[in-house]
UniProtKB/Swiss-Prot annotation:
EC number(s) given by UniProt: 3.4.21.-
PDZ domain location: 312-384, 880-960
GO MF annotation list: serine-type endopeptidase activity
Official protein name in the record: Pro-apoptotic serine protease NMA111
Gene3D superfamilies (alphabetical): 2.30.42.10, 2.40.10.120
Organism from which the protein derives: Chaetomium globosum (strain ATCC 6205 / CBS 148.51 / DSM 1962 / NBRC 6347 / NRRL 1970)
Enzyme class: hydrolase
Biased composition regions of type Basic and acidic residues, renumbered to the chain: 15-24
PANTHER family referenced in this protein's UniProt entry, alphabetically: PRO-APOPTOTIC SERINE PROTEASE NMA111
Pfam families noted in UniProt: PDZ_1, Trypsin_2
Disordered: region residues: 1-48
Designated gene of the protein: NMA111
Top-level taxonomy: Eukaryota, Fungi, Dikarya, Ascomycota, Pezizomycotina
Family, similarity comment: Belongs to the peptidase S1C family.
GO cellular component, one term: nucleus
């Protein structure tokens, strides 16, 4: 990729926020901590989001607890007031179902309170309602539950209004808390009644200490501005967002919004003047007009204003008109190309608006909201000079996105005023709110602005849509983009546009009448353009004295694998590596299974760094960590060389030549020596089982290059490949939360039987023993009961390694053999079909035999058994179901390797953030045994039961954890954003898989009309996009 991407570190164009009382602070709504503990390494269907707004919730709460103020018993007046208030306070459980603007996809809980019991309006924070799709419900004090949906979210200020059906509350009277912003005074005692720290009801006391602080800053997410906030000491924490701040008479005088995270008990409240106006507009059926001039003002005290140019004459007038005021409004940010551009400047002191002296945000909001589309006159002081300007007031709603388009796995909307204000840029451009699918850029998951697509400028969303309509499926196009943190750098990349896994270009538009976002299909994909043959030449390997070794450059190809759906616990959505061409005439390439883990994927093969062709999976080895893929050789006019694989085992101490490709794809080479050949044990991942190599010999070499390269070969002087150098996926490091990868060699003789069958057009049908072996030395073998005669035979059979193999783990098979006729943990295998087993490659005999004559030692007794092998062709996943944002499929091979009993054939493999599965805690590695009391032993039964469940209704899942702990989860179905979908492997389909959608009681072949990007999608890492081939 040309250009460089911007760093991850948080930095805006604004000055760094001060580490003082006016710094940015976390908002008080609680994310579901119980489903993503710090040590969790199970895959979700989107990127790991460590708490919201950069704060880890549990740490945040622990830091806040010591700061809770001790309070004595409430007076009778307060007790009576609280009893009236709590009836109107609700706990809000909600999902923001996809990333949008400043908000990531998440599940959380917060607080709200009823402000109109007749119409069913609830006031809460805007960062709870969010700017994008919302799905949630409210729980009242008597534990009655009712659905709620947004009818208004303010473009700037931190409040939103939800609507519920008042008739649904049957067992308690619901009143409305009166909003009285006029009663907020310094020194009054208040109570914050809400869902503090995720508890059902908490009542925190405090005293309002300030009415004139600037809005708190929360970092790169949503932040309020152009308003003052109140300050008090109440020690509220996660979950208290949206709580009413009430006085002793039971009036709501403010709205809880945020607080400090450093242990101080300071909290910040939003004044209720603007929420009260919005509520009245809704009650009267009037539009809620919001005006703005794209200039952020802040409150600054008189001493600072003097330094900015406030003259003594104007200060005297202001102090006389407003004796209690100590601050004035000063321009902080003026957005380029906005109404205030070139008229107001940063540092201007605001004196008058339309001839009226003005020092408060509330009055400024009044004027702007009533002047949308009209000019206002501002008198400013700039360095002591009076400047009078006329500025046209814009419509805030028009620069607040209310729609997004999903195409090629990504989602896009117009750049919002929130983002533009944060970074001080013009409020225009195409913003990537969900960087998934084809549009997953490097180094950061959000904050991108698309500049051009396919050499066409995309200044706005409408133009972007038209450009994308004209791009064919599977096209490779040049895209330029910038990051909001670094607009100086223009990044350029080439994207492979995927319109076959996700065929529809969906436009989602906010509907404030229903609270849902309505989906429309804008365009079906244009068919792929037929590829044409292309010509290319390979580079030449310099500084090597062996021409045959140098020629191997022509046997390497670059392989990229993109997986639109997370299956089998695999942690990534895209991988790349170098593959070795083993048959240029047939286009066969061998590559690590750490790069191509399963066949629901898009593979591109790049030859000679020039020719790009499609590839497909031909074979996946169940144990030895390699895959064989195929490209169409007719499309390649280049001198590709078929690598010659050695049939002789490489030995320890042998001289060899290492050729590898390092982390940036550059070829490196060195003469070296084989240091060790050993039976490797790749650690199993403790969190979520995923493919790992077992029962395989690994090779190490004496060169530091080997640790830098994930792809390569060991080659003899005559150019014969002695071993492949592969990446082996290991466990997730509990400290760094990164996946360990091991770089090791695999001897080529073990590949030859499989390669020869594929070259003959035969689909390899391997057999295997369902166990995992570990090498033991003779001292251990003697203690296990191996006789001296067998120990002597081992010494003669393998002079380099005196070892035998013991069974350490049995793989659970669906049709278990009788224990007497099967291998058990602790068995030491002496021979198979008369061959003494002293190295792992001796076990390859199992791949071609349905039954083996085994001699083994069990409990110090030598036994002769006939061992049945099992077919290896049913260990790959061939069917999956996406339901309520989770991916279900039969337990894959890695699960059966690590578990001693299968509880059902319905296994939770992954889940999407912001989905019902995430909200209700249905985690990966669970097994589903019953749906609404009906047994679901397999996917067929599971699918039959879940499609019967009506939309937006509760159902019960009986689950079993990986550690055999049964539990029951109740969930609510959501078909609108997370439709039920079935994926079936089908070689007749163009992309090898068929999709069936079950939505609204209908069975749809292919993709349904609704559903958000990421409905089974990419972990940011999760970030996952499960829209699949229709």
């Amino acid at each position: 990729m040309n250009g460089t991407t911007s760093p991850i570190a948080a930095r805006s164009k604004r000055k760094e926020p001060p580490h003082t009382v006016d710094g940015r602070h976390p908002k008080h709504h609680r994310t579901n901590g119980e489903v993503a503990p710090a040590a969790d390494n199970t895959p979700d269907n989107q990127d790991e989001f460590e708490g919201e707004f950069g704060v880890e919730l549990e740490e945040y709460e622990d830091a806040r607890l010591p700061a809770v103020l001790p309070t004595g018993p409430d007076t009778a007046e307060w007790q009576a007031t609280i009893q009236r208030v709590v009836r109107n306070v609700v706990s809000i459980r909600f999902c923001q179902t996809c990333s949008f603007d400043t908000d990531p996809a998440l599940t959380s809980e917060a607080t709200g309170f009823v402000v109109d019991a007749e119409r069913g309006y609830i006031l809460t924070n805007r960062h709870v309602v969010g700017s994008g799709p919302f799905w949630g419900y409210c729980i009242f004090d008597n534990h009655e539950e009712v659905d709620a949906y947004p009818v208004y979210r303010d473009p700037v200020h931190d409040f939103g209004i939800l609507k519920f059906d008042p008739k649904a509350i049957k067992y308690m009277p619901v009143d409305a808390l009166p909003l009285r912003p006029d009663l907020a005074k310094v020194g009054i005692e208040i109570r914050v009644v809400g869902n503090d720290a995720g508890e059902k009801l908490s009542i925190l006391s405090g005293v309002i200490s300030r009415l004139d602080r600037n809005a708190p800053e929360y970092g790169e997410g949503y932040s309020d501005f152009n308003t003052c906030y109140y300050q008090a000491s109440a020690a509220a924490s996660g979950g208290s967002s949206g709580s009413p701040v009430v006085n002793m008479d039971g009036y709501a005088v403010a709205l809880q919004a945020g607080g400090r995270a450093d242990g101080a008990a300071t909290d910040y409240f939003l004044p209720l003047d603007r929420p009260l106006r919005a509520l009245k507009c809704l009650q009267e059926g009037n539009p809620i007009t919001r005006g703005d001039i794209q200039c952020q003002f802040v409150l600054k005290p008189f001493d600072e204003c003097r330094r900015l140019g406030l003259t003594p004459e104007w200060e005297a007038q202001i102090r006389k008109a407003f004796p209690k005021e100590t601050n004035m409004l000063v321009a902080e940010i003026v957005l380029p190309e906005g109404p205030s551009h070139k008229k107001a400047e940063e540092g201007d002191v605001l004196i008058k608006v339309n001839g009226e002296l003005l020092t408060q945000f509330i009055r400024l909001d009044d004027i702007l909201d009533s002047s949308v589309g009209k000019p206002v006159k501002l008198l400013l002081l700039r360095g002591g000079e009076e400047i009078e300007v006329e500025i046209e007031v814009g419509d805030l709603h028009s620069i607040t996105p209310d729609r997004f388009v999903s195409v090629a796995g990504g989602s896009f909307h117009s750049l919002s005023y929130q983002q533009a204000r944060l970074y001080g840029v013009a409020c225009k451009g195409v913003f990537v709110c969900e960087a998934g699918g084809s549009f997953r850029f490097d180094n950061a998951e959000n904050g991108w602005l698309i500049q051009t697509v396919d050499h066409k400028k995309t200044p706005d969303l409408e133009t972007f849509i038209e450009v994308m309509k004209g791009i064919h499926d599977k096209a490779r196009v040049v895209v330029t983009y910038k990051h909001l943190r670094d607009l100086h750098t223009l990044n350029t990349t080439i994207l492979h546009i995927d319109r076959h896994w996700s065929k529809k270009m969906k436009l989602a538009v906010r509907n404030d009448e229903t609270g849902l976002w309505d989906f429309t299909n804008l365009a079906d994909p244009l068919p792929p353009v037929a590829p044409i043959p292309r010509k290319a030449d390979f580079i030449q390997l310099e500084h090597t004295s062996h021409p045959a070794v140098a020629d191997l450059v022509r046997s390497f190809v670059h392989v990229s694998c993109v997986m639109p759906v997370k299956l089998d616990g695999f942690p990534k959505n895209r991988k790349w590596g170098m593959g070795l061409v083993i048959d240029a005439d047939k286009g066969l390439v061998v590559i690590s299974r750490a790069i191509v883990p399963y066949d629901l994927c898009d593979i591109t093969v790049t030859i000679a760094d020039s020719i790009v062709v499609e590839g497909k999976v031909v074979f996946l080895h169940p144990l030895q960590n390699y895959a064989i893929i195929q490209y169409d050789p007719k499309l390649v006019d280049a001198p590709v060389l078929s690598a010659r694989l050695s049939s002789q085992e490489i030995t320890q101490g042998a001289s060899t030549y290492f050729i590898g490709y390092n982390r940036i794809g550059r070829i490196v080479h060195a003469a070296t020596t084989v240091t060790e050949i050993f039976a490797v044990t790749i650690p199993a991942n403790s969190g979520a089982p995923r493919y790992r190599a077992v029962n395989v010999d690994a090779i190490t070499v004496d060169t530091s290059l080997s640790g830098q390269c994930g792809s390569g070969v060991l080659v003899a002087q005559d150019g014969t490949v002695q071993a492949l150098w592969l990446t082996y996926l290991g466990e997730r490091n509990p400290s760094t939360h990164r996946d360990e990868e091991y770089h090791l060699g695999l001897a080529t003789p073990t590949l030859l039987p499989v390669v020869e069958q594929i070259q003959r057009g035969v689909d390899p049908k391997l057999r295997m023993l369902s166990v995992e072996f570990r090498a033991i030395q003779m001292s251990q073998a003697r203690l296990m009961g191996v006789s001296e005669e067998w120990i002597q035979k081992v010494s003669v059979a393998n002079t380099a390694h005196h070892q035998l193999f013991m069974v350490t783990k049995r793989t659970f098979e669906r049709n278990e053999q009788e224990e007497a006729a099967a291998l058990l943990e602790g068995d030491v295998v002496l021979s198979l079909n008369g061959k003494i087993i002293t190295k792992i490659s001796d076990l390859d005999i199992m791949y071609s035999n349905e039954q083996l004559d085994a001699v083994l030692v069990r409990n110090c007794e030598e036994l002769s058994l006939k061992l049945d092998t099992v077919a290896a062709d049913d260990v790959e996943t061939t069917r999956a179901v996406s339901f309520c944002g989770a991916i279900f499929h039969a337990p894959h091979h890695a699960v059966r390797q690590q578990i001693s009993k299968l509880f059902s054939e319905v296994y939770v493999s992954a889940r999407t953030r912001g989905s019902p599965s995430y909200q209700y805690g249905l985690a990966p590695t669970n097994f589903i045994t019953h749906v609404n009391g009906k047994p679901t032993p397999d996917l067929e039964a599971f699918l039959a039961e879940v499609v019967k469940i009506p939309d937006n209704t509760y159902f019960r899942l009986r689950a079993m954890s990986f550690d055999s702990v049964p539990w029951v989860v109740t969930m609510k179905k959501n078909d609108h954003y997370f439709p039920t979908m079935e994926l079936i492997k089908d070689p007749k389909e163009e992309c090898g898989w068929r999709r069936i959608t079950y939505e609204g009681g209908k069975v749809i072949q292919g993709e349904g009309p609704d559903g958000v990007v990421g409905s089974a999608g990419e972990i940011t890492d999760m970030d996952v996009d499960a829209d699949v081939c229709g």
